Amino acid sequence: MAQVAKKILVTCALPYANGSIHLGHMLEHIQADIWVRFQRMRGNQVHFICADDAHGTPIMLKAQQMGIEPEQMIAEMSQEHQQDFAGFAISYDNYHSTHSDENRELSSLIYGRLKANGYIKNRTISQLYDPEKGMFLPDRFVKGTCPKCKAPEQYGDNCEVCGATYSPTELIDPKSAVSGATPVMRESEHFFFDLPAFSDMLQAWTRSGALQEQVANKMQEWFDSGLQQWDITRDAPYFGFEVPDAPGKYFYVWLDAPIGYMGAFKNLCDKRGDLDFDEFWGKDAKTDLYHFIGKDIVYFHSLFWPAMLEGSNFRKPTNLFVHGYVTVNGAKMSKSRGTFIKAGTYLKYLDADCLRYYYAAKLSSRIDDIDLNLEDFVQRVNADIVNKVVNLASRNAGFINKRFAGQLADQLADPVLYKTFTDAATSIADAYNNRESGKAIREIMALADVANRYVDEQAPWVVAKQEGRDADLHAICSMGINLFRVLMTYLKPVLPSLTERTEAFLNTELTWDSIEQPLLGHSITAFKALFNRIDLDKVNEMVASSKEDMAPATRVTGPLADDPIQETISFDDFAKVDMRIALIQQAEFVEGSDKLLKLTLELGGETRQIFSGIRSAYPDPKALEGRMTVMVANLAPRKMRFGVSEGMVMAAGPGGSDIFLLSPDSGAQPGMQVK
């Protein structure tokens, strides 16, 4: 009995329309595209959509800095984004914008239903206000000194040095990041979405299979701490949709951003005329809805979004597929090192299929981070795609074209071996379907090794020189071409450009259901180079170009310029600080935090536990173990969400991945005082 085709709607998280797409973004779009292409190969009806997230204060301010209207900026950015995604062969059916008529109508509809159902609450709040710009300031547009560790130049929501979270009103000496003015407190009435009203529904949905176990466990922490009402409005000036019947109030960007999924699909429905919007978004929809997202936006997609849909009588997602971050060469992407690589820059130097393959080989259904090690990237692509797969075709095609007029043999040389290859279709399909592309790639490459071993053992280059063995040569090389065809069919979701060239060479379409029947008596075309080996020099040029792309303007920079020396203190004040040499006995990740490491320090007879916001700079915490450092030993213990921190390690640098732990000279011992 034939399997009934599924109707599936797939989305990727909406890129923010104030910057270029980079290789971190591309992980998600490539992962989703591989899954979509596989589903289409299996006969399912898939609609794949995305859009630019085009609202919010950052876009409004950046457009002002550029001297243009926000509408012009987001239009130009949308064109750039779509060009980048096309360059990576991301097969979107529609790419739209949240700044659209469809999104405005749907946002107003959902808000109206939530309000009518009693889920919108009004409350007066106090906010920081920029008196020079005449605007309320979002958390990230306020900077000041951390109220916990006293680190300067920290954002209004959390400290990148000690990891503390707080409200912008707690900052010491806060300044507007927009004008530099000292903000003042002002009151404003805001509208809130009553998220706690959906707690029971969300807890049931969490454990329904809609989320990966890691995500469901994280959500349980949020439930345990209690859900809070969500502020869904912002005050003018703001670039976005004005709230109906509330002049001067605008929907917060995170309200209309996920509704952008619906708006993009509605736009596709209107374009085509053969799609039913309600079939995919109606309360009782039987179709499948999947969101591919990064772990940084799980909170919005696993709490607010399903609650908004439930409260406005729309369906909830079938699944959220969450992935981790991308690091490059074991560290956070860096503009100064040239590893913050834009998608457009990559495409100037390298084939998109190379990155698609490398990401596919590393991806799984878990939310682990993926490291793009550039040397390994070159070696793996060259070894797997060029040496194992494409080489299989080139080793056999020449003989078929020259000796047999491009026609394959009428029979298979080794039907048993061929069946081994086609039998693997089930397990490879399961891996793709479960988003275990790394597992699929490993199985495909194992088959490629078998195919090349067959050719090595049969040695067609030797047989070709032996008189009277034309039939053997024909059979061997035809077998090699047929094995190549099976491998490329399995790789089709990953390598669309190579697939297109392969189909032209084999003179046939690669389909999952056709591999059971080998190509017998079939004519192929003249072989042309299908794939070029990656040149490490090209990778180095790409990195160098990324440094130039991200180079700052002519402003003078440096440690003192970026972080001026603070006010003079007395010697007595300094003498109160007790700094000691410490041995890092153990370093480990802190579950639930993307910024902190937990350090166990030995002070020569005393052990301390410290939480330090250095994870981005030290992605492999084990590398710190056994190292000497300097700590503030008499800092009052501070209770954090993850435990008690008993001091502070000393480090230099601006923050993020550019943090450098201090180390003493040789001879210093744990417990020694730094004087």
UniProtKB/Swiss-Prot annotation:
Domain tRNA-binding: 573-675
Location in or out of the cell: Cytoplasm
GO molecular function: ATP binding; metal ion binding; methionine-tRNA ligase activity; tRNA binding
Cofactor note: Binds 1 zinc ion per subunit.
GO BP annotations listed: methionyl-tRNA aminoacylation
UniProt short sequence motif 'KMSKS' region, positions renumbered to this chain: 332-336
Residues bound to Zn(2+): 146, 149, 159, 162
Gene3D superfamilies, per database record: HUPs, Isoleucyl-tRNA Synthetase, Domain 1, Methionyl-tRNA synthetase, Zn-domain, Nucleic acid-binding proteins
Motif annotated as 'HIGH' region, chain positions: 15-25
EC identifiers of the protein: 6.1.1.10
UniProt superkingdom: Bacteria
Annotated positions binding ATP: 335
Predominant localisation class: cytoplasm
Metal-binding keyword on record: yes
Keywords for this protein: Aminoacyl-tRNA synthetase, ATP-binding, Cytoplasm, Ligase, Metal-binding, Nucleotide-binding, Protein biosynthesis, RNA-binding, tRNA-binding, Zinc
Catalytic reaction(s) noted: tRNA(Met) + L-methionine + ATP = L-methionyl-tRNA(Met) + AMP + diphosphate
CC annotations in GO: cytosol
Pfam families for the chain: Anticodon_3 (PF19303), tRNA-synt_1g (PF09334), tRNA_bind (PF01588)
Subunit structure: Homodimer.
HAMAP family reported for this sequence: Met_tRNA_synth_type1
Record-stated family: Belongs to the class-I aminoacyl-tRNA synthetase family. MetG type 1 subfamily.
Role this protein plays: Is required not only for elongation of protein synthesis but also for the initiation of all mRNA translation through initiator tRNA(fMet) aminoacylation.
Name the record gives this protein: Methionine--tRNA ligase
Native source organism of the sequence: Yersinia pseudotuberculosis serotype IB (strain PB1/+)
